[in-house]
Amino acid sequence: MSISLLGRIVSQQFSGIRAAGPGRSLYLPFTLLLKQPGAYKVNLHRYVHSTQTKSHLSFLMNNNDITPFQKFTVKVLKEQCKSRGLKLSGRKSDLLQRLITHDSCSNKKSSVKINEPKKKRILINDPIKITKKLVSDKTFRTIEKNISSLQNTPVIETPCDVHSHLQPRDRIFLLGFFMLSCLWWNLEPQESKPTIDH
């Protein structure tokens, strides 16, 4: 006897309690225990979250093809993020969210027109005529100003150029400095000599 045939015989002899589900029924083989007086009817339900199997969300790929997001792999999502300059780490849902927000922001930016003020063109009907006299006057004046400004600048003389010898006050300062350093140098060896006390 095969196992499937044995299962049918058992299910026919012992009618089980029907487990009501959203489209399926199931006969449980342990229903003899539940048929005792006082046993209650058992209903088994399978609750499944209501996620849509298909979504109409799509992305515009680089080559302008529209592809639904179910077909995207993590590798393709990372390539899309890289091409848009977005962060590459995270889960598939994070990558999708980044792409969605980036695409929605770029669509908003492209739909908003920026009204730039038109550049005004200045049209000159009559060109300005310049005579040689105007050019020569202008050139002469600028050269003249440059020459006069060079002549009026004061020349600063450095002390080395003016005085090649020492002044009397400089001699006094150097002589005093030399004497103080000699005194200090002579006093130092005397202080360092050990004194012997008897």
From Swiss-Prot:
Belongs to the AIM34 family. One of its GO terms (cellular component) is mitochondrial membrane. It is found in: Mitochondrion membrane. It comes from the Eukaryota. This is Altered inheritance of mitochondria protein 34, mitochondrial. The gene is AIM34. The keyword Acyltransferase does not apply. InterPro entries: SAP_dom, SAP_dom_sf. SUPFAM superfamilies: SAP domain. It is a single-pass membrane protein. Residues 69-103 form the SAP domain. Residues 1-55 form a transit peptide. The lineage of its organism: Eukaryota, Fungi, Dikarya, Ascomycota, Saccharomycotina.
